[in-house]
């Protein structure tokens, strides 16, 4: 029977890498970040609603959403973040639901890659939750390098979410990503073997 698994974690814990690895095992990925971009793509109703709230500056010269401009505003103004979420979230849910149902109809196991799964209380929409774990210090280091952020800004992003330790305690399974990509792959393979998704290579 097909399963729906929610993959989550904290910012820069390695969720996307885990999703990428899972595709090699035949899982189908429904990515909340991709759906979010689809929800406000050029010419969409969602983008038009964003412009109504955030003004012309919210649209760049290519007719796309100016993510940096909108991101800076909502990071510092919770009321506007809530307004943006009210526009985007229903559209994202509809896109993801359609993708998920399409994969389930064809008998695939589905991974719902949702960074804010616990923050948005979506754990009941999946059969299991797998959390990708790394330490907060590694999260901060990765963010500083990947996004070219200051230490202060990186910490602010990490601490704006439910802590990775708390998410790990709530999860059905935790995937350790404290090491390199090879170790992550080995940890993921072990979980898939234990849960019966793949056969052990020793069998």
From Swiss-Prot:
<comment type="pathway">
    <text>Cofactor biosynthesis; coenzyme A biosynthesis; CoA from (R)-pantothenate: step 5/5.</text>
</comment>
<comment type="function">
    <text>Catalyzes the phosphorylation of the 3'-hydroxyl group of dephosphocoenzyme A to form coenzyme A.</text>
</comment>
<dbReference type="InterPro" id="IPR027417">
    <property type="entry name" value="P-loop_NTPase"/>
</dbReference>
<protein>
    <recommendedName>
        <fullName>Dephospho-CoA kinase</fullName>
        <ecNumber>2.7.1.24</ecNumber>
    </recommendedName>
</protein>
<keyword id="KW-0547">Nucleotide-binding</keyword>
<feature type="binding site">
    <location>
        <begin position="12"/>
        <end position="17"/>
    </location>
    <ligand>
        <name>ATP</name>
    </ligand>
</feature>
<dbReference type="GO" id="GO:0005524">
    <property type="term" value="F:ATP binding"/>
</dbReference>
<comment type="similarity">
    <text>Belongs to the CoaE family.</text>
</comment>
<keyword id="KW-0808">Transferase</keyword>
<dbReference type="Pfam" id="PF01121">
    <property type="entry name" value="CoaE"/>
</dbReference>
<keyword id="KW-0963">Cytoplasm</keyword>
<feature type="domain" description="DPCK">
    <location>
        <begin position="4"/>
        <end position="203"/>
    </location>
</feature>
<dbReference type="GO" id="GO:0005737">
    <property type="term" value="C:cytoplasm"/>
</dbReference>
<keyword id="KW-0067">ATP-binding</keyword>
<dbReference type="GO" id="GO:0004140">
    <property type="term" value="F:dephospho-CoA kinase activity"/>
</dbReference>
<keyword id="KW-0418">Kinase</keyword>
<dbReference type="InterPro" id="IPR001977">
    <property type="entry name" value="Depp_CoAkinase"/>
</dbReference>
<keyword id="KW-0173">Coenzyme A biosynthesis</keyword>
<dbReference type="GO" id="GO:0015937">
    <property type="term" value="P:coenzyme A biosynthetic process"/>
</dbReference>
């Amino acid at each position: 029977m097909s399963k729906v698994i929610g993959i989550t974690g904290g910012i820069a814990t390695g969720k996307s890498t885990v999703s990428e690895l899972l595709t090699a095992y035949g899982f189908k990925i429904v990515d909340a970040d991709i759906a979010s971009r689809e929800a406000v793509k050029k010419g969409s109703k969602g983008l038009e609603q964003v412009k109504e709230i955030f003004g012309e500056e919210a649209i760049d010269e290519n007719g796309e959403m100016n993510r940096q401009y909108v991101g800076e505003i909502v990071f510092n103004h919770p009321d506007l973040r809530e307004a943006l979420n009210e526009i985007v979230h229903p559209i994202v849910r509809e896109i993801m639901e359609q993708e998920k149902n399409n994969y389930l109809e064809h008998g695939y196991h589905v991974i719902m890659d949702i960074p804010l799964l616990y923050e948005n209380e979506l754990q009941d929409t999946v059969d299991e939750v797998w959390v990708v774990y790394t330490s907060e210090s590694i999260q901060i280091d990765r963010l500083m390098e990947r996004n070219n952020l200051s230490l202060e800004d990186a910490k602010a992003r990490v601490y704006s979410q439910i802590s990775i330790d708390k998410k790990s305690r709530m999860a059905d399974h935790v995937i350790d990503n404290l090491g390199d990509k090879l170790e992550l792959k080995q940890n993921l393979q072990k979980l898939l073997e234990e849960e019966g998704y793949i056969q052990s290579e020793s069998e």
